[in-house]
Amino acid sequence: MASEQNSPDALLSIRSSCNRCRNHKLKCVVTEAPNGTACCQRCIRAMVPCKFGRRERKKRGSSPRVVPQSPWMHSPWETTSTSMQSIYPNTEAMDVGRADALVVHGTNAFPPPANVPAEQSLTGDHSAILTPGSMNMGIFNHLSLDANNLEADDIHAYKFPHGQLHEAHHTQYWHFQADEWRMDHPNDDSHSDYSATSSSKAATAALLQLAADLQERLDALENEPSWRRKNASMDKYPIGSVLQLSSKLQQLGRCLQTDDSSSTQSESSRSRASVGATSSVHRLQMPVLESGTSDACLNVSHLTSTTRFDTSVSLMLLSCFVTLLQISTGVLGHFQDYLHAHPKTRARTLSMSAAQSSIVSLGDLDPQQQTHDRIHTAIYVLLNSLEEVEEALCLPPRVRLAITLQASPRSDGSTSEQEKAMSAAFYGGLSAATEGIDDILTEFGRRVNDTKGMLRQHMDL
């Protein structure tokens, strides 16, 4: 017993979380096992042994005085004391020391905001510097990140300052303005590069989330039964969810665009930082389909426009666009199922009294086929949204499918050169990786034309 008390491990307390929950960073809920020992509920469900380790001894010794190394602790009047109960230093600073801590080599290292008086920069409350759980620095309250006082929305706004998540159709989407991702700092190239990199990473993360949402929506369309089996009417068909996904892709396409000036400025700053190093970001422009070409021959010359995309971003945008086309094709398939299940009905005529009345106007006539009119409107709304996505992705006008289907609709099911050359117009060197894109585009065009033809037959047009 004496040897056990004298051992160094005897003074170390047992952890309140088991080793398995600590490794996975999960909350450990401890319950008493039938044999009287404590066991974690997660370990009980996983049927694995539950072990509670002891806290580790500090590997570095504590010192009553610490030599300051940061600009906040360079003043000789500041002292830092360390206690065994807390790992955070307790900083006690005099007013002179606080004033010196804000001045580095005769200049104010952290200038106050424009709306704060200059004399307030030395009289603010700086006693909370380097205190546990807070970074309240008086005039620098706009930089404080006190997690105990912040709500969930505030923490999310700090992590994603330019975007907000909204719950719609059991999926989270991004809402932001396109100009918020572009930050111009002509006087500071390094700060401009940092801001552009941060906004690009956030937009790329939102693009990955959108790709997952599109795939989830496509799987739901392919696996669920036809809409006519659920409802006899198409009035409550959720067409807005598809339009919202299209709107998100359009916004991300505009946010991720770069131009030659920003690219040149970014590359020049990189060359100054590392002499002789080449840019690691490869830019790619969409090729143009020349007029008068046959068999969808393409010219891979660059566009006259300065809009460009990163190679990795352009591939993700292409994947999202193709998935959106597949979703639109599935929606048109639901419309066709409804038209097949409800055969053509003869239009009703007016009553004798209404037909002989001279005061009956066109607005007094009741619509005979409201559902068919709404389906027809939904088709053009889908095509308009796809046209806006094509513009946001900077597709050449000669290879845009949506505007072609609206301008010259065909009912014979033929395939145009635009549909055949779509994938090659995106990336001429990736034909092996984009073999199925032509089939998806052709199927979408055929489905649009077939649905329009069925509507014309049902509506006697």
From Swiss-Prot:
User: Could you say which residues form the signal peptide?
Assistant: none
Q: What compartments host this protein?
A: Nucleus
Q: GO CC terms on record? A: nucleus
An example of a GO molecular function for this protein is:
zinc ion binding
**Which Gene3D superfamilies did the record assign?**
Zn(2)-C6 fungal-type DNA-binding domain
Q: Look up the domain of life of the source.
A: Eukaryota
List residues annotated as DNA-binding. 18-50
- What are the Low complexity biased-composition ranges? 256-274
Q: Does the keyword Magnesium apply?
A: no
**CDD domains, per database record:** GAL4
Please give the InterPro entries that the UniProt record associates with this protein.
Zn2-C6_fun-type_DNA-bd_sf (IPR036864), Zn2Cys6_DnaBD (IPR001138)
Q: Where is this region: Disordered?
A: 55-79, 256-278
Instruction: Provide the alphabetized UniProt keywords.
Output: DNA-binding, Metal-binding, Nucleus, Transcription, Transcription regulation, Zinc
**General function of this protein:** Transcription factor that regulates the expression of the gene cluster that mediates the biosynthesis of the trans-fused decalin-containing tetramic acid phomasetin.
Protein name, per record: Transcription factor phm6
